[in-house]
C-alpha cells in the first residue's frame, strides 16, 4: 500500500511539472508573437516612412512626402491638380 501511495505522489508531481513547463512555454510564445509586427505593417513601413497606400495623417509620414489625409500617394502631384 505504501508503494502505491508513493507512486501516485510521484506521478502527481511529474504531471504538475509538465503542466507548469507547458504553461511557461505558451507564455513565452505569446510574448514573442506580441512583439512582432504584422507582415502587412512590416511591408508598408520602409526606412521609417510609409510606402504607397500606407495609412497616414501628414506628408512627412510618407516616403513620397505626399499624404492625401488617409493614404500615402505614389508621388507628389504638381500644384493645381
Swiss-Prot record:
Signal peptide bounds: 1-19
InterPro entries: Conotoxin (IPR004214)
Keyword Manganese: no
Keywords: Disulfide bond, Ion channel impairing toxin, Knottin, Secreted, Signal, Toxin
Name used for this protein in its record: Conotoxin Vc6.13
Domain notes: The presence of a 'disulfide through disulfide knot' structurally defines this protein as a knottin. The cysteine framework is VI/VII (C-C-CC-C-C).
Distribution of this protein across tissues and organs: Expressed by the venom duct.
Source organism of the structure: Conus victoriae (Queen Victoria cone)
Family according to the record: Belongs to the conotoxin O2 superfamily.
Disulfide linkage: 49-63, 56-67, 62-72
UniProt keyword Disulfide bond, yes or no: yes
Residues that make up the propeptide removed upon maturation: 20-44
Amino acid at each position: 500500500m505504501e508503494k502505491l501511495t508513493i507512486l501516485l505522489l510521484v506521478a502527481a508531481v511529474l504531471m504538475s511539472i509538465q503542466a507548469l513547463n507547458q504553461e511557461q512555454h505558451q507564455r513565452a510564445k505569446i510574448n514573442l508573437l506580441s512583439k512582432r509586427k504584422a507582415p502587412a505593417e512590416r511591408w508598408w513601413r520602409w526606412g521609417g516612412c510609409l510606402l504607397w497606400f500606407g495609412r497616414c495623417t501628414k506628408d512627412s509620414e510618407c516616403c513620397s512626402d505626399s499624404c492625401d489625409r488617409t493614404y500615402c500617394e505614389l508621388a507628389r502631384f504638381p500644384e493645381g491638380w
